[in-house]
């Protein structure tokens, strides 16, 4: 677990996708559209896992509770050779139940974003300049568009040392998706 100290934090962004980059990549909404307006919030201290939950760790939960394994498993066994890769095919409810079993909880979006941006409020965990080679992204040269072992991109860690907050696999948070309060973006969801 990584300790994140209390303090003020700029949640969201005031940036606009003026170049329509997202749309050019086939993403149906402009970057940042649902992350505005930016607001200053004060967050209490919290802890967050250093790495994504691995297949090996998730198997302890499956075995311990007799929970239903993800759909990509063969019975109670995860795919061979994926011990230290982040577990996939896990619903929000599965993730929440795992957290309860582990005596933890899914972080709310504000805490997840704070862990990713650091107290400086970087745009990316490593700073304000996008560097695709620092994370396991599907368009990274040499990428097979598959997850890799957690912590494989140490230079992408946040200032406090949380890994894989960009790329590899998506993470669940404890709140529903929705544009930020005060946003003009209209979501279809």
Name the predicted role of every residue range.
Residues 38-40, 49, 159-161:
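Short, surface-exposed beta-strand/loop micro-motifs that present aromatic residues
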Residues 8, 38-40, 45:
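Well-ordered beta-strand positions in beta-sheet-rich domains
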Residues 4, 48, 54, 58, ...:
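Terminal peptide-recognition signature
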Residues 10, 14-19, 23-30, 68-189:
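Functional-site microenvironments in short loops/helix caps that host divalent-cation chemistry
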Residues 46, 53, 59-71, 102-103:
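Short capping motifs at secondary-structure boundaries
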Residues 1-10:
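Mature N-terminal segment immediately following signal peptide/propeptide cleavage
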């Amino acid at each position: 677990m990584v300790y994140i100290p209390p303090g003020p934090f700029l949640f969201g962004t005031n940036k606009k996708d003026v170049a329509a980059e997202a749309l050019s990549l086939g993403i149906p909404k402009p970057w940042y559209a649902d992350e505005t307006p930016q607001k200053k919030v004060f967050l209490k201290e919290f802890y967050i896992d250093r790495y994504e939950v691995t297949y090996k760790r998730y198997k302890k939960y499956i075995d311990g509770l007799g929970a239903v394994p993800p759909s990509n498993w063969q019975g109670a066994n995860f795919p061979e050779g994926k011990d230290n890769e982040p577990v996939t095919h896990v619903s929000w409810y599965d993730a929440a139940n795992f957290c309860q079993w582990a005596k933890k909880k899914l972080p709310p979006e504000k805490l997840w974003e704070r862990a990713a941006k650091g107290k400086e409020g970087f745009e990316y965990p490593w700073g304000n300049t996008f560097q695709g080679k620092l994370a396991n992204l599907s368009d990274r040269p040499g990428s097979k568009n598959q997850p890799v072992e957690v912590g494989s991109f140490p230079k992408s860690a946040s200032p406090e040392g949380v890994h894989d907050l960009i790329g590899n696999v998506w993470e669940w948070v404890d709140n529903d998706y929705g544009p930020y309060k005060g946003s003009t973006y209209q979501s279809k969801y």
